[in-house]
Amino acid sequence: MADSCAENAAKGTENERPKEVEASADTVPQVEEGVEEYLKRKNMVLLDYEKQMFLDLVEADGLLVCAKGLSYDRVVISILKAYSDSGNLVLVINSSDWEEQYYKSKIEPKYVHEVASTATERERVYLEGGLQFISTRILVVDLLKQRIPIELISGIIVLRAHTIIESCQEAFALRLFRQKNKTGFVKAFSSSPEAFTIGYSHVERTMRNLFVKHLYIWPRFHESVRTVLQPWKIQSIEMHVPISQNITSIQSHILEIMNFLVQEIKRINRTVDMEAVTVENCVTKSFHKILQAQLDCIWHQLNSQTKLIVADLKILRSLMISTMYHDAVSAYAFMKRYRSTEYALSNSGWTLLDAAEQIFKLSRQRVFNGQQEFEPEPCPKWQTLTDLLTKEIPGDMRRSRRSEQQPKVLILCQDARTCHQLKQYLTQGGPRFLLQQALQHEVPVGKLSDNYAKESQTRSAPPKNVSSNKELRREEVSGSQPPLAGMDELAQLLSESETEGQHFEESYMLTMTQPVEVGPAAIDIKPDPDVSIFETIPELEQFDVTAALASVPHQPYICLQTFKTEREGSMALEHMLEQLQPHYVVMYNMNVTAIRQLEVFEARRRLPPADRMKVYFLIHARTVEEQAYLTSLRREKAAFEFIIDTKSKMVIPKYQDGKTDEAFLLLKTYDDEPTDENAKSRQAGGQAPQATKETPKVIVDMREFRSDLPCLIHKRGLEVLPLTITIGDYILTPDICVERKSISDLIGSLNSGRLYNQCVQMQRHYAKPILLIEFDQNKPFHLQGKFMLSQQTSMANADIVQKLQLLTLHFPKLRLIWSPSPYATAQLFEELKLGKPEPDPQTAAALGSDEPTAGEQLHFNSGIYDFLLRLPGVHTRNIHGLLRKGGSLRQLLLRSQKELEELLQSQESAKLLYDILHVAHLPEKDEVTGSTALLAASKQFGAGSHNRFRMAAAASRRGRR
């Protein structure tokens, strides 16, 4: 099935395969012998198409885009081994944790260096050479501070290159590297062709950010790939499992409601592009993420009905997935959540449709019979799986004359929940497992049906080692399992619908407790699918497959495994195949990547047809499951066609690799015009040319390198100086200090009072403090909540605005800047620095510390300054006169109201200050008038209350200046 689907996807595009592969094919025979000897010496076993990938990237830097499952990881390992030498310094960036651990395990430890925690230690490690897996944020700071010898870097390897955008830290590091190193290599890898179809000119922009000129395209239908995999084709058997009438009807009704909502959202929003909103996309794509990205910029302009429909489409899709993949009891419990009165009043109205009523009715019928007795229907694939394990596979072993061997079966599932479901079914039987699910989900069982009771009575005592202690402990842990990084959309949906208090394992090893005969008598065996004939192997808790197999040397092995795991990612399947060497693989769910991994694994083994593993595909024909699989193939094929077409039309400048200074001429430079004849003619006669202007500098706090703004500032030609500062985030000039806040950070800082303290420090040390409120460029330039369906109301937004108003009242010198995106912020910083002096890093680092800066004279006690500023009648325009002439706090308390009026130059301010110091004034409830608004501002920002002022005033009588 895998080959046929891939071959069908390749029709019409075989003539459009990458030209660089064809062009380099003639050069392969000339170096073939040398390459084979080199790979053998380095102990690198590669398939023919992997060798070609390796040769292409060694010959010229470039971006390699391959199909999922073709495993470019061996090519990466080969390149890492080729540069494994203490005389080379190779950096690997943008790798996930499991990728880093996997690659490190394949390289000699003496060439791999761990990243040190201190800057001094990192400088020493850099000079030792070898391979470095380093965080991009640390790398950027070290490059800016010149802790790493940039000119000595041999090259950089970039993984997951489809995520490299102009403003990301990886692009920043590559730009810093290429500006000072013109000889090092850049080799990038990606296995996500669909990502390059999003946005305008994504392929060209990614290559420009990577500083590469060559694009290598390797789809599954590439001629070299087909030539390698076709001779070792896996034995695939496609088994169409029929679904029950109830599931078919539920699926039809859900699709009917989704179609109605799609038409409704298009009718309401005729002026908005809703091309991506189709029933097919709602079912098979990451619909909610795509639609959210499309509507984010106008989300605040949409009416409430549209927002409810978008949320309901996601819910309906979850119901569809739950019906297809979960057991009947879990699906019914999930459906019940959306039949409550509270939800009926908060959705778009789909629960009132006749189709919705049928969905709830049919879901209940899957659990209870006509007499309302508990009789849940089993999952359609359960019986087929049991037949495979007890009849088909033993019979095939007998027919192939491998009776003396114990079969090893690998069952692949989509997610950990399905894996746990199958483990419970195989070890406990269907009736017992479904009854446990009913009790767990609080489904009222009531009375058991006669048929179900008889099936349950066939159960004997619970089998030994049904589940290990570790599994029991994990199931008792509260809190649902978070979605894995990199998990595909189906697994995310399944994890979203998990009940709270559950945590599922990703691998189980089982063995048969009732061995099935493989002789002639096996034909008459009719095993009871509801009686457990399997038990778990506890040794797999330590992820030791070898020990698990050794513990049961004469029994069949059955391994349950997810397509990818949190610990090893997509490498988990390849690792399991190498350790287990299965005879049979059962694809309980469909996955394109896993199918190709099986093909590549079989091509590496090069076994005769009789010894190759058999792969059984369990699939519901003409259902959403089959449609999702075929759509994923079609999307990948269309993505590769788009990339191939883009490459044929792409114009790549010769300087794009950054090895000449032409690549950086587009960056803003602040040097004078070149001293050519035209430039000299424009100068006044006899005048000497002006001195070269200094590149503008911006001091950036180290914590700000988590954002995109430092990268964009550098791209505009400003020099970025990373520094640990305690006041502000960006220092533009000696007088301008900027505190940057995103919307979510702004709300949190206003509520906690942290922003108030930050403004106090900025106003104390800088003449022009600035609060920068920066919006996400992909979100509307409008105050709203963080999430797509925000619970923030206009009242909550008004509360934020009121707090900002109080902040500006309390700090008159504070300026607010509203920026729609980091790009606009970078341009604004450049304009603010025009004609201004440069900031001093030493002065900026010393401000806010306990020790005064060089030449700074502390005129006033900062504690007294802050205390007086909080008193009514005292503000920034009169506090300095009060501090100079008021003497001490004790003398201030002894002054009359007339004397205070002379100090403050205001009768009203003097009265307010005198009353707060001498009169037992307690404000009435809800009374905030006149200048006492400043007191309210102090309360808003956690600065204290009137009682605290009275206590402080009493204490100040005993204080000294």
From Swiss-Prot:
GO BP term, pick one: DNA recombination
This entry's Gene Ontology molecular function terms read:
damaged DNA binding; protein heterodimerization activity; single-stranded DNA binding; single-stranded DNA endodeoxyribonuclease activity
**Could you tell me which Gene3D superfamilies the record lists for this protein?**
3.40.50.10130, 5' to 3' exonuclease, C-terminal subdomain
Region of interest: Disordered:
1-27, 451-485, 674-693
Regions of biased composition (Polar residues) lie at: 458-469
EC code: 3.1.-.-
Record key words, sorted:
DNA damage, DNA repair, DNA-binding, Endonuclease, Hydrolase, Meiosis, Nuclease, Nucleus
- Which stretches are tagged as biased composition: Basic and acidic residues? 13-22
Give Gene Ontology CC terms. Answer: nucleotide-excision repair factor 1 complex; protein-containing complex
- Which subcellular locations apply to this protein? Nucleus
Q: Between which residues do disulfide bridges form?
A: none
Query: ERCC4 domain: from which residue to which, for each copy?
Result: 697-777
According to the UniProt record, what class of enzyme is this?
A: hydrolase
The UniProt family comment states: Belongs to the XPF family.
- Subunit (UniProt): Heterodimer. Interacts with hdm.
Q: What does this protein do?
A: Implicated in recombination events during meiosis, mostly in meiotic exchange. May directly resolve Holliday junctions within recombination intermediates leading to DNA exchange. Also required for the repair of mismatches within meiotic heteroduplex DNA and for nucleotide excision repair.
Q: What is this protein called?
A: DNA repair endonuclease XPF
**Gene that this sequence comes from:** mei-9
